[in-house]
Design a protein with these regions (language model features):
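Bacterial lipoprotein signal-peptidase II cleavage site
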Residues: 23-32
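Extracytoplasmic small-molecule ligand-binding "clamshell" domains
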Residues: 33-147
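Short loop->beta-strand "edge-of-pocket" segments that line small-molecule binding or catalytic clefts
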Residues: 83-86, 104, 185-199
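Acidic, polar ligand-binding/catalytic clefts
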Residues: 112, 116, 124-187
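A ligand-binding cleft/hinge motif common to bilobed small-molecule-binding domains
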Residues: 134, 150-159, 228-262
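Periplasmic-binding protein-like
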Residues: 168-176, 243-284, 304-320
Length: 320
């Protein structure tokens, strides 16, 4: 028998049914959580063995924010807006403000900075709300210009898309109900653990906790609903995401253990648009220089994750 469903579960589920958009444009929505959890199977993916996953394309010369005729950035400017794939239900990173209706967060601030660099106006963007599993697809199909959705830079993803330099280093942890007998990664055997489908969190769970029973959902909010309904025993994901979930549910807690992975976030760009990657890296360098990265971290993440260790140093040298 399922444990009692807390009232918050119904609130969260109801919010998920609302259509979401941004900047006056609404072309998609956040899927509702699954009616039944999807149990995943298959062999755990092998640990990644490449040593250059953080290496990106260096910004261009003396004017990294130049927009040459015929460039990807020029095409975006002619269109009149930047199109970005984002989350709209990941509190602190990309979520709808219930008062203003705007989708906002740490990841959204990067979209604004890219739009500002192209148009001189940080509001010239359209947000396409996507699930974690759709991040590669929308880039491969050129449905968006960038994806800013807490996406870990991995060797496998480099095979189908391109990444900016690392803009944040997260780490994977575990969230449980208060009073749970789960104390860490080594106590997950026999427990149902939720992670969004198509994420490195799910891959890491399969590899590092083979005795756990993995359960997939469209997003972490869907996992939270399953936890509240008693259909899963724990959620695993990046510390940034879990901090956002715990801040919304007084019965949830992130286990006080060291992160068991490193999850470097990058801005995703279509693989054939190297000029756009260089441009985005120029934007990131500008955020380092003018303090806007630190300001964004202080606003969104510092209250929950503590003082920043600083914007990650970029690694360049990748060639097309």
């Amino acid at each position: 028998m399922n444990r009692p469903v807390h009232r918050l579960a119904g609130v969260v589920a109801g919010l998920l049914l609302l259509g979401l958009g941004a900047c006056g444009v609404d072309d998609t929505f956040v899927p509702s959580p699954p009616s039944a959890p999807e149990v995943t199977g298959g062999a755990a993916p092998a640990a990644q063995d490449c040593n250059d996953r953080l290496q990106s394309y260096a910004p261009n010369g003396s004017d990294p924010l130049a927009i040459p005729s015929g460039s990807t950035m020029s095409t975006i400017r002619q269109r009149g807006r930047l199109i970005a794939g984002v989350s709209a239900d990941t509190f602190l990173l990309g979520a709808r403000n219930p008062v203003t209706g705007a989708v906002e967060g740490f990841d959204i601030d990067f979209v604004k900075q890219i739009a500002k660099a192209i148009f001189g106006d940080e509001t010239r963007y359209q947000l396409r709300v996507i699930t974690a599993a759709q991040r590669l697809e929308v880039l491969q199909n050129h449905e968006v210009d960038v994806v800013a959705r807490n996406m870990t830079i991995t060797c496998d993803r480099w095979k189908s898309i391109a990444f900016s330099a690392e803009y944040y280093l997260a780490g994977q942890k575990i969230l449980v109900r208060k009073g749970s007998d789960i104390t860490g990664l080594d106590s997950l055997d026999g427990h149902r653990v939720c992670a969004p489908l198509g994420t490195s969190s799910m891959d890491n769970l399969l590899r590092l906790a083979p005795g756990a029973e993995p359960v997939g959902a469209d997003n972490h909010t869907g996992c939270l609903v399953l936890l509240q309904e008693g259909q899963v025993d724990a959620i695993t994901g990046d510390d940034t995401v879990l901090a956002g979930l715990a801040s919304q549910d007084p019965y949830a807690v992130v286990l006080d253990e060291a992160a068991f992975t490193e999850e470097p976030y990058g801005i995703g760009v279509p693989a054939d648009q190297v000029d756009m990657v260089r441009f985005v890296n120029g934007v990131l360098e500008g955020m380092r220089a003018d303090g806007s990265w630190e300001a964004s971290y202080a606003r969104w993440l510092q209250p929950f994750l503590g003082t920043s260790s600083g914007q990650p140093q970029p690694q360049y040298g990748r060639t097309p």
